[in-house]
Amino acid sequence: MSITSIINNLIDIITLYIRIFYVIYYIAIKSKNQICIANILYTSIKFYYTDIIDAVLKRGIDPNIPFPLSENSYVNPLIYAIECDNHDAILSLIRYGADVNTYSNYLVITPLYISVLHGCPKCVEILLYYGANINIVTYKMVTPIELASRICYNNLAFMVCDRTITNIPKKITYNFEIMKILVSHFILQASNDRLNNRHNKYFSEGYNKNKMLVSTSIILTYFKKQCIEDIDIMKNIKLGDDSFLDILVERNTMKLSTYISNQDILDIPKTVKVYNTRINMLLDEAIIYNNINIIL
């Protein structure tokens, strides 16, 4: 190990301990709460201390541990990370086994629903990539796509009424991005027969509601057309017995890693309009998988 690596490791360790002391100080003195492992995890998420989050999760804490305060019974670490817009914490929690479809009370408020509600496109993208069910409905029978559509029309109505607005607010831009991500995932899921045959839960009341919305809403239909164009492109890219579309839907990083040296595969994100981010996430995973195999 080089001197530079030793120094960097030492700096990381010192930084970790300083942050741990500050988190404990914040919990005990500023917040006047009990010092426990759950509070340490939630406070670390709040302050974006990914090193503490990883250290706590490595020690075996439940990544779905409830929020310490009973009045926030719907909150778990994943939902809290979404409310803090902490993408690194979301990824760490998922890697250590956080349930992307979890909900802790009768409202059936899932992490995906919270991401849509808070207007976090990146959070929505991450959750869907790692298996969040787009067809789960709340106790009021609302799907994430329906929620995003309602927010969109409320925002547009507000813009029409308030004539002082000259630029499109960020929240409206984010909402459009979220709707595009949700529609793209729904269309991608529906395009793969093997996936649908394995998971009959997708054929539910939520699925039927989403299907109707995507087929009737003017805005959602526009996104749907873009998705279908991308899907046709990916269907025609063959990797052995499978198309690139099958590999993307099923997140088959093992198979994709065997083709990762092919520049045409690496250039696929440039040929599509909607699925760029998801394809790049899959390619990154395949590259990491390939590098690990080379080392081993």
UniProtKB/Swiss-Prot annotation:
The lineage of its organism: Viruses, Varidnaviria, Bamfordvirae, Nucleocytoviricota, Pokkesviricetes. Pfam families: Ank_2. This is Putative ankyrin repeat protein FPV216. PANTHER family: ANKYRIN REPEAT AND PROTEIN KINASE DOMAIN-CONTAINING PROTEIN, ANKYRIN REPEAT-CONTAINING PROTEIN-RELATED. Keywords: ANK repeat, Repeat. ANK repeats lie at residues 73-102, 107-136.
